A protein has these predicted regions:
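Nudix hydrolase/Nudix homology domain
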Residues: 27-29, 96-130
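Conserved Nudix-box catalytic region and its N-terminal flanking loop in Nudix hydrolases
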Residues: 13-52, 56
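A short coil-to-beta-strand element that immediately follows conserved catalytic motifs
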Residues: 56-65
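Active-site-adjacent beta-strand/loop module that shapes the phosphate/pyrophosphate-binding cleft
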Residues: 69-91, 103, 107, 124-128
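Short connector loops at helix/strand junctions that flank enzyme active sites
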Residues: 4, 31, 76-78
Length: 130
């Protein structure tokens, strides 16, 4: 079976909002994420993807989840990290040209927006409660 591994960054600002992105081919929002490149650690992938998709520099605080699933016959492993914004400014610089919007979403917005990965909502809400 073919395998794919990626990383996702959960970044919460001082207003208790989560940084989310929307891609042109999705009806929903998701945390910044993407595939691990050759020679890259999951942590390095997370930092790179957040920068590319949102413009923000982040540092990894801790790994908080690993999601394993099968999508269209591909074994998918996604590493989730809690990250902290340390610099940069908002601006999408996605080399894949997939991300069309990045925004901070509040707790009330998280409960009402469409999610690209609805199964992640519980994890996001848990992170806001910490």
């Amino acid at each position: 079976m073919e395998r794919w591994s990626g990383s996702a960054g959960i970044c919460i600002n001082e207003k208790m909002e989560i940084l989310m992105v929307k891609s042109f081919d999705s009806q929903g929002w998701a945390v910044p994420s993407g595939g691990i490149e050759e020679g890259e650690t999951p942590e390095e992938c997370c930092v790179r993807e957040v920068k590319e998709e949102t413009g923000y520099d982040v540092k990894v605080i801790e790994q908080i989840n690993v999601k394993r699933t099968i999508i269209k016959g591909i074994q998918v492993t996604t590493y989730y990290f809690r990250v902290e914004k340390i610099g940069g400014s908002s601006g999408i610089n996605d080399p894949d040209k997939i991300i069309v919007e990045a925004d901070w979403k509040s707790l009330s917005e998280l409960k009402t927006i469409d999610h690209a990965y609805p199964e992640d909502l519980e994890l996001l809400l848990e992170q806001l409660e910490q």
